[in-house]
Amino acid sequence: MRFKELIFPLRVEEEEIVEKFYEEGFFNFAIEEDEKGKRVLKIYLREGEPLPDFLKDWEIVDEKITTPKDWIVELEPFEIVEGVFVDPTEKINRRDAIVIKLSPGVAFGTGLHPTTRMSVFFLKKYLKEGNTVLDVGCGTGILAIAAKKLGASQVVAVDVDEQAVEVAEENVRKNDVDVLVKWSDLLSEVEGTFDIVVSNILAEIHVKLLEDVNRVTHRDSMLILSGIVDKKEDMVKRKASEHGWNVLERKQEREWVTLVMKRS
């Protein structure tokens, strides 16, 4: 599949543009540094797909036709947390570490973003052998794959974006792990209960998730909620408290916060 890559100078705060994309239901983007160290926004449009309305007045600094394979060439293997590597190139072959093979496609979440790193950090810290895990808003599937390789007995990964589901399914096959990936609008298609629910999405969507999360958890379950901008942390905490969840641990990188929660 061919895409048009458009590059814009980043004129607003990162969290502001991420929120805007999620509001518009647009997921094919990345925020990176260019060769001069300046933050830029990259978006990827399928053939014939229009430019999102809120970007029509933005200056385009570069434009080219590209494919997912082109993006993988630009990525190198890296250690996302101690002992866990992400490898978009399939260059790593080691038995003393967990290696996640990744074809990013155009779904958000290669492991480079702080919210993904913090999520994997807490999965590694709290996941026990044999736990069941639900990944809500799975994107590339990186958290679901990490959970399975860290010892989860059952992993379900869901996303509302059909292309994210396709990318996650491809990555699950690439890693040869048993993870069920399916479409779901938050928990609409999810059945059963899980020991850990991990979700790397926006604060406003966490608030909606918390309305129904008790249905898919039990008394000893744990929530790992990431993708929260620090100024909206209290909003998530209040909603969690309303439904019987308290913060067990908190981690922050730049303006991004990840919360680990248990039932009160």
Curated annotation (Swiss-Prot):
Its main location: cytoplasm. The keyword Cytoplasm applies. GO terms for molecular function: protein-lysine N-methyltransferase activity. It comes from the Bacteria. The keyword Cytoplasm applies. It is an enzyme of class 2 (transferase). InterPro entries: Ribosomal_L11_MeTrfase_PrmA, Ribosomal_PrmA_MeTrfase, SAM-dependent_MTases_sf. S-adenosyl-L-methionine binds at residues 116, 137, 159, 200. One of its GO terms (cellular component) is cytoplasm. It is found in: Cytoplasm. It catalyses: L-lysyl-[protein] + 3 S-adenosyl-L-methionine = N(6),N(6),N(6)-trimethyl-L-lysyl-[protein] + 3 S-adenosyl-L-homocysteine + 3 H(+). PANTHER family: ELECTRON TRANSFER FLAVOPROTEIN BETA SUBUNIT LYSINE METHYLTRANSFERASE. Methylates ribosomal protein L11. Belongs to the methyltransferase superfamily. PrmA family. This is Ribosomal protein L11 methyltransferase. The gene is prmA.
